[in-house]
């Protein structure tokens, strides 16, 4: 019977749809949805619990409470299906129609929809061209609005107060019409002719010259165009009929004790109905206008609260003073419909438990507790029991399982075999946070996890929990096995390096095994093969670390064949034993060295590239088993005596104390300022800490060689003891990369060093003790600062980082690889990244896995070695490096010409798989995860070094890294001072070192004021100092000699005499014009002029302009009036801020600000054109800088006086070059230098932040996000298209429209790129469903409804929300096939389906 009933329940058909449209409902539409009018505020009868008739839960309107049974019980059972009971009027049908049938309320007076009124900018206001304030006054009955002026001089939309209205009525009688409330507004909207308005606005747009007016018109035009295009009538923004939600969606549940739990909506609806009924009665009674008005206002407020409580005025509250949850609150926010129920569904067949380590597992296995497995695999067990005939019904099978009879366990074993399960650890920050494993049944209640996948899950075994999910359908199991199995996720999608890398004890074991000990037992023995070594080791003839000679059999893979060769190596016993687990094809020298963490990672990488996935997985497992086994045998422990405090520590500390006293003396005698003293003291202690740490590491890192016969230390010829690398436990742990770092050991055994205050500044008294010696109370107290800051930071940053990830995912979620090749030849030129003369990232790393855009030519014989369109793999980049090619043009996601999505060639290699990317890969989400995931990790890691001020020592000189010849860059300018030193006076000067062939080896910036120690054309050796400068101050240097004459240097006006409290000496400091007392002096700037012997002003070379040097705010003037100065002398010093400690805390906000494309506070100014700089007349508080371009057109800039201008008179600047100091504004970079420069800027800046933390992310991911930030364009000239100048549209839409217009032979639109921050880009996407589920739900839906937007369900989010397969990965095939079939239905013919597509459709459960 039940099966039969179920058959009848399936009445609804599967809806097939391609898009979802949103719009405004007309009153007729609302009535057509409705099944009856709700007239009473009653809900259910408190005695019978039956719904009241015509009430909010009325069965007649909304349907029966029980399946196939009317309310009075006259008709029961299925046979009366569809009958309407004549007694109670209820249709006999399923009770679930109460979830979908709506009612309506006929409002006695129209009310405005609050979303269109109050959601800024107010749509009602825009359509009527009235201010929000005015509309509100009309709606809430404070003023009349003229709806039809007739022949009177009144204006349409004019507001009249009560008195005005009376006066005008007396004056004009019935010649005009004015009304109050929503009726007035509705009349205005009714009589609005949208077409005429649009034509008027377009005309006005052509004639107006004012920028603000233009903006206003274009906004209004956009809204009116939207109404006209969508066919929505503006008067529908005023509600005459209110729809009522189906009752099951706002349930009323009886609790024990006769009380009810109810949805807030019932309360809100009740208020609306009460007020509406009262209003109807008042209107019937012809009550006085003032009472009716009040009631209408209350109705308007009640409807406002129902739609969006708290949007206007005070929120309506329930009995317990809690604001009621309105319809808008139901859908928005984290707990709203979108994020809670549509995107965040819970999953059936899952369990969670604590994880413990499973060192005996293979990489593709996980240990699943039997109890858990039994529960999770129940349906499969029931099925098997039925098939085997052990249980006749499901009920019997259930009983069998509950009794846990022995046969059940056998069946469980059988069911589980080769049925993968998915493990997930929250927070799932990237796709490796969920992986599939084959379960192995274990006793106990904890899940066993393979140690090597911990890095991917970021899991440890200190109480972490994981969830298990069971894939049910065959397709799901297949996807798990082929795509999600842990053995298929060896590489990290963020950077393409192995993520299955041993850590901790495994590393320690392998490190110990491959270390070499001098004079160990059995040193120098020869062995014929590995088994001999193994036998000797097991019999204790040789030690693990002894150096021996052994013949090793290796396999070479050549042309797909394995060739065997035997070589004799000098190696150690441990390494020889490890060679047994090397996969065939890897040479022995790869492990014939000390294996540290980095080396092991390289080893696994080499194995993956040479031997493939399967071999690598087996190898990784073997490495793990070996590592654990040898770590146990090594018996490395940790104890207090391992922490050796260096003997020189006291001497270093006392020397530093002396230095500090000296600085204090200089300070008291006035030679240095307070800031300089602080900086120097901090520097001294920073250096002392480093020296102690170095001494400690030197001492820890070596130990004497012990003679095995005598048991004493061996000595060399000079009588000094011979030393070897140390076997100190702590040193080994840090050196191998297993645990701990030099910085942490330094705190254990060196000195803790400088600590930071919570605001980031450094306390100048360091902690000289270490943890081994113990801290005293004061030192402990200072330490608590850092520790507490670390913990507080962690909590805050986790939230910030999660939010960044969410925004990134949202902006890129619809970016999927949709085609093989878009055919473009554009790309970016990649060079090695060099900073401070150091190669930060080699060219090979930047182009690996990219596709070449142009042919790569061998520089020696001009032959093409790699044609355009080829993917560069490891061998190719090796060749490029070997040939010394400096730059390569590669394809990039930025220039990909695919309309929706990306093409595989522009993306290149799929980093997580090591192969070219497949069509259907969701590269956008992967990019977002790759950037977001380390953010969280880093922020969680701030507290590991307990706030010890790891302040980067400030660079004060550059040294050459290689031998070569020095060349100054063309931008370098310098002067020679009296001491015959060269002083750099250009801001962009660089020292370049070339090799003998003239190829550039390194390049270093020489800052303004640096002393150049090596001249152009000289030969340098590696390690030689090229230039030096004072890092703490920026000098202002004179390029001319003469006698100093001050102008406008007036004490208390432009400069302040600062007398140091301690020394009593005075210095002149330039003060901020804003802080000056006297108003007239605002424009004065302190200037130095130079006079020659005759007392005339020194002129600039080649011109008759006098030299005058201006000082910026904060400069400390070092010369005195009348003093004689020579070329290259310092006139003033500008103190630099003492640097605060930089950890990712500076980093995370920095990344967010880059991706949000925010303009920095004090942005620098870039030159708009290429031309010559000159200075014009200063105006109030600003200096005027003029750039005259090559055509003689001048461009003026007004720059605040306190800003530092980097360009000088007569200098030639290029377009986009910086002329005023300050951080760059990404919008300027895009405008002046183009997309490529912008991408390079954002990529480099983001990479800088992550590099500081040692996190590797491939540039590709950042480029993908920049592409999404640039996906909208602004129309400059609309041509013959339908766009409005200044409108922002999606690039793809713009190109499609232009193509269409060009086909018709008309003029296409021109446009410029717009840079949108990720939040803005997410909200301005074409898909309103995606935008609404991200942020600002109300605003997005309001806008979409007016425009009658259609969502084509292109992205991933939209499809998840409507409950479809996503158009990525395996779901892409399904979507393509559906499209193909739709085509077939439309045209009657279609390309044939492949067999696999047919199979996929059949299995996906969708009707073909």
From Swiss-Prot:
Its cofactor is Mg(2+); Zn(2+). Zn(2+) 1 binds at residues 70, 72, 85, 88. GO terms for molecular function: DNA binding; DNA-directed RNA polymerase activity; magnesium ion binding; zinc ion binding. It is an enzyme of class 2 (transferase). It comes from the Bacteria. Zn(2+) 2 binds at residues 822, 896, 903, 906. GO terms for biological process: DNA-templated transcription. SMART domains: RPOLA_N. Residues 1386-1408 are annotated as: Disordered. InterPro entries: DNA-dir_RpoC_beta_prime, DNA-dir_RpoC_beta_prime_bact, RNA_pol_asu, RNA_pol_N, RNA_pol_Rpb1_1, RNA_pol_Rpb1_3, RNA_pol_Rpb1_3_sf, RNA_pol_Rpb1_4. PANTHER family: DNA-DIRECTED RNA POLYMERASE, DNA-DIRECTED RNA POLYMERASE SUBUNIT BETA. This is DNA-directed RNA polymerase subunit beta'. It comes from Nitrosospira multiformis (strain ATCC 25196 / NCIMB 11849 / C 71). The lineage of its organism: Bacteria, Pseudomonadati, Pseudomonadota, Betaproteobacteria, Nitrosomonadales.
């Amino acid at each position: 019977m039940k099966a039969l009933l179920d058959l009848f329940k399936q009445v609804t058909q599967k809806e097939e749809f391609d898009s979802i449209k949103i719009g405004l409902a007309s009153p007729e539409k609302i009535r057509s949805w409705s099944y009856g009018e709700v007239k009473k505020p009653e809900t259910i009868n408190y005695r019978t619990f039956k719904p009241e008739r015509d009430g909010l839960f009325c069965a007649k309107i909304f349907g029966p409470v029980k399946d196939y049974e009317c309310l009075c019980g006259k008709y029961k059972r299925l046979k009366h299906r569809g009958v309407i009971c004549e007694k109670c009027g209820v249709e006999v049908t399923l009770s679930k129609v109460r979830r979908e049938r709506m009612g309506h309320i006929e409002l006695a007076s129209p009310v405005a929809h609050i979303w269109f009124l109050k959601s800024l900018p107010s749509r009602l206001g825009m359509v009527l061209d009235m201010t929000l304030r005015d509309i509100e006054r009309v709606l809430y009955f404070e003023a009349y609005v003229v709806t039809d002026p007739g022949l009177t001089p009144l204006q349409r939309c004019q507001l009249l107060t009560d008195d005005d209205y009376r006066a005008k009525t007396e004056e004009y009688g019935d010649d005009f019409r004015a009304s109050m409330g929503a009726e007035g507004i509705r009349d205005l909207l009714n009589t609005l002719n949208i077409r005429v308005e649009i034509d008027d606005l377009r005309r006005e747009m052509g004639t107006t010259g004012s920028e603000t007016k233009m903006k206003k018109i274009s906004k209004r035009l956009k809204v009116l165009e939207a109404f006209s295009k969508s066919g929505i009538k503006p008067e529908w923004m005023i509600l005459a009929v209110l729809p009522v939600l189906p009752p099951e969606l706002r349930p009323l549940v009886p609790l024990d004790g006769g009380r009810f739990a109810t949805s807030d909506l019932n309360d809100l609806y009740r208020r609306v109905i009460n007020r509406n009924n009262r209003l109807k009665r008042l209107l019937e009674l012809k009550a006085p206008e003032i009472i009716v008005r009040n009631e209408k206002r209350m109705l308007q407020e009640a409807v406002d609260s129902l739609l969006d409580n708290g949007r206007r005025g005070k929120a309506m509250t329930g009995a317990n003073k809690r604001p009621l949850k309105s319809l808008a609150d139901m859908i928005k926010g984290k707990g709203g419909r979108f994020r809670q129920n549509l995107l965040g569904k819970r999953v059936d067949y899952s369990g969670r438990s604590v994880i413990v380590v499973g060192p005996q597992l293979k990489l593709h296995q996980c240990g699943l507790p039997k109890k858990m497995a039994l529960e999770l695999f129940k349906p499969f067990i029931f099925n098997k029991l039925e098939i085997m005939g052990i249980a006749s019904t499901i009920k019997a099978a259930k009983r069998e399982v509950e009794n846990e009879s022995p046969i059940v366990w056998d069946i469980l074993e059988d069911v589980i075999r080769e049925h993968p399960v998915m493990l997930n650890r929250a927070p799932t920050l990237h796709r490796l946070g969920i992986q599939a494993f084959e379960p192995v049944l274990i006793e106990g209640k904890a899940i066993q996890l393979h140690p090597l996948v911990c890095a991917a899950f970021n899991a440890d075994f200190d109480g972490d929990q994981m969830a298990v999910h069971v894939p049910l359908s065959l397709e799901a199991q297949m996807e798990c096995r082929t795509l999600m199995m842990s053995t298929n996720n060896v590489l990290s999608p963020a950077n393409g390096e192995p993520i299955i890398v041993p850590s901790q004890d495994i590393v320690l074991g392998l490190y110990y095994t491959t270390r070499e000990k001098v004079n160990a037992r059995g040193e120098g023995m020869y062995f014929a093969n590995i088994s001999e070594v193994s036998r000797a080791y097991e019999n204790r003839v040789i030690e693990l670390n002894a150096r021996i000679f052994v013949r090793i059999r290796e396999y070479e893979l050549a042309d797909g064949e394995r060739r065997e060769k035997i070589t004799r190596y000098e190696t150690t016993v441990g390494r020889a034993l490890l060679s047994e687990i090397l996969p065939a094809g890897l040479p022995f020298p790869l492990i014939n060295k000390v294996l540290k963490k980095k080396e092991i990672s390289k080893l696994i990488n080499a194995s993956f590239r040479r031997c493939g996935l399967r071999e690598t997985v087996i190898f990784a497992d073997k490495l793990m088993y070996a590592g654990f086994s040898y770590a146990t045998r090594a018996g490395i422990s940790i104890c207090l005596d391992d922490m050796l405090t260096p003997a020189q520590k006291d001497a270093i500390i006392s020397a530093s104390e002396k230095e500090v006293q000296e600085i204090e003396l200089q300070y008291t005698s006035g030679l240095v300022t307070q800031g300089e003293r602080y900086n120097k003291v901090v520097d001294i202690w920073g250096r002392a800490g480093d020296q102690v740490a170095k001494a400690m590491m030197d001492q820890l890192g070596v130990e004497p060689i012990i003679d095995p016969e005598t048991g004493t230390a061996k000595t060399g010829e000079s009588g000094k003891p011979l030393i070897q690398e140390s076997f100190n436990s702590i040193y080994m742990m840090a050196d191998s990369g297993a645990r701990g770092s030099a910085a942490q050991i330094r705190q254990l055994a060196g000195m803790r060093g400088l600590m930071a205050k919570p605001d980031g500044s450094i306390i100048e008294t360091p902690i000289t003790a270490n943890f081994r010696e113990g801290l005293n109370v004061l030192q402990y107290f200072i330490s608590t600062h850092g520790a507490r800051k670390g913990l507080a930071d962690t909590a805050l940053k986790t939230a910030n980082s999660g939010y960044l990830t969410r925004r990134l995912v949202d902006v890129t979620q619809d970016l999927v690889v949709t085609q093989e090749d878009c055919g473009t030849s554009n790309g970016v030129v990649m060079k090695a990244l060099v900073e401070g003369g150091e190669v930060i990232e080699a060219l090979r790393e930047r182009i690996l896995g990219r596709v070449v855009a142009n042919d790569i030519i061998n520089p020696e014989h001009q032959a093409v070695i790699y044609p355009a369109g080829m993917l560069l793999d490891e061998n190719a980049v090796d060749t490029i490096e070997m040939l010394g090619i400096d730059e390569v043009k590669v394809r990039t996601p930025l220039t990909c010409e695919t309309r929706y999505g990306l093409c595989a060639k522009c993306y290149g290699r799929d980093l997580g798989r090591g192969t070219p990317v497949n069509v259907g890969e969701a590269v956008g989400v992967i990019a977002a995860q790759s950037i977001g995931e380390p953010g969280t990790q880093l922020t969680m890691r701030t507290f590991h070094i307990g706030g010890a001020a790891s302040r980067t020592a400030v660079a004060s000189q550059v040294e050459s890294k290689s031998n070569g010849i020095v060349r100054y860059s063309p931008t370098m300018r310098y002067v020679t001072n009296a001491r015959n030193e060269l002083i750099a006076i250009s801001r962009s000067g660089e020292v370049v070192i070339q090799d003998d062939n003239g190829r550039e080896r390194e390049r270093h910036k020489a800052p303004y004021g640096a002393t150049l120690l090596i001249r152009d054309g000289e030969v340098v050796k590696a390690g030689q100092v090229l230039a030096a400068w004072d890092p703490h101050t920026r000098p202002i240097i004179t390029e001319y000699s003469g006698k100093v004459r001050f102008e406008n240097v007036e004490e208390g006006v432009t400069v302040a005499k600062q007398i140091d409290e301690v020394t009593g000496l005075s210095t002149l400091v330039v003060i901020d014009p804003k802080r000056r007392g006297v108003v007239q002096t605002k424009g004065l700037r302190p200037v130095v002029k130079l006079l020659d012997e005759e007392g005339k002003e020194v002129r600039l070379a080649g011109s008759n302009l006098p030299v005058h040097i201006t000082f910026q705010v904060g400069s400390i003037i070092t010369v005195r009036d009348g003093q004689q100065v020579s070329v290259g002398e310092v006139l003033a010093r500008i103190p630099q801020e003492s640097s605060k400690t930089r950890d990712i805390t500076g980093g995370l906000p920095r990344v967010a600000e880059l991706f949000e494309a925010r303009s920095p506070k004090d942005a620098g100014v870039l030159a708009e054109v290429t031309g010559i700089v000159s200075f014009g007349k200063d105006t109030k508080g600003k200096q005027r800088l003029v750039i005259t371009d090559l055509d003689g057109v001048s461009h003026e800039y007004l720059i605040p006086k306190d800003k530092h201008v980097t360009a000088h008179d007569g200098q030639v600047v290029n377009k986009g070059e910086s002329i005023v100091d300050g951080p760059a504004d990404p919008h300027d970079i895009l405008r002046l230098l183009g997309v490529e420069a912008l991408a390079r800027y954002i990529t480099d800046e983001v990479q800088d932040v992550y590099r500081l933390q040692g996190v590797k992310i491939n540039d590709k991911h950042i480029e993908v996000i920049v592409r999404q930030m640039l996906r909208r364009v602004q129309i400059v000239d609309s041509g013959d298209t339908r766009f409005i100048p200044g409108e922002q549209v999606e690039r793809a839409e713009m190109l499609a429209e232009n193509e269409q217009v060009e086909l018709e032979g008309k003029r296409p639109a021109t446009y410029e790129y717009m840079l949108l921050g990720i939040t803005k880009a997410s909200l301005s996407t074409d898909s309103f469903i995606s935008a609404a589920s991200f942020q600002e739900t109300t605003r997005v839906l309001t806008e979409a409804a007016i425009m009658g937007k259609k969502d084509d369900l292109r992205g991933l989010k939209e499809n998840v929300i409507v409950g479809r397969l996503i158009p990525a990965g395996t779901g892409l095939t399904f979507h393509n096939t559906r499209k193909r079939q739709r085509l077939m239905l439309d045209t009657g013919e279609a390309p044939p389906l492949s067999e696999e597509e047919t199979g996929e459709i059949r299995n996906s459960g969708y009707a073909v």
